[in-house]
A protein has these predicted regions:
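Short Lys/Arg-rich basic patches
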Residues: 2-40, 59-84
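Surface-exposed, Lys/Arg-rich phosphate-binding patches that contact polyanionic backbones
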Residues: 20-53, 85-105
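Short, basic amphipathic alpha-helical segments that act as recognition/interaction helices
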Residues: 51-73, 103-119
Length: 119
């Protein structure tokens, strides 16, 4: 069952969260997949919903973070989040390159397929 507090603050839909939970991946692998999917959804939001092209650059990531009401309460978290976005971006760009698509074209299904093929 999906915690309502998590769902209301997540950029992932309930069906996307369920899709991740329904995989036969370990708890750690599902967590990693959720983090990547969460970052991908944030990147798409930063790109104003574009579904193709490169991931937003560091400057656009910072602007997006500063515009988030939930981050305005704890701006000391923004550098940590930007570091996490940078790490996720590297991983997402690698997956996109392997699939021959742009990073913003990635979908949750692509990420699930990549993780399950590694196991």
């Amino acid at each position: 069952m999906i915690d309502q507090n998590i769902q209301s603050s997540s950029p992932l839909s309930a069906s996307e969260i369920k899709m991740i939970e329904d995989t036969k991946l370990s708890v750690l692998e599902r967590h990693h997949l959720r983090v990547l999917a969460h970052c991908l959804a944030c990147f798409k939001d930063m790109a104003n919903g574009l579904n193709e092209g490169s991931l937003p650059n560091q400057e656009n990531r910072l602007k997006w973070c500063l515009a988030q009401p939930s981050l305005s309460k704890d701006q000391s978290f923004i550098p940590v989040l930007l570091d996490q976005f940078a790490g996720a971006a590297r991983q997402l760009e690698t997956v996109a390159n392997e699939l021959g698509i742009s990073p913003l074209e990635l979908t949750l299904r692509d990420l699930i397929q990549k993780v399950t093929l590694q196991n």
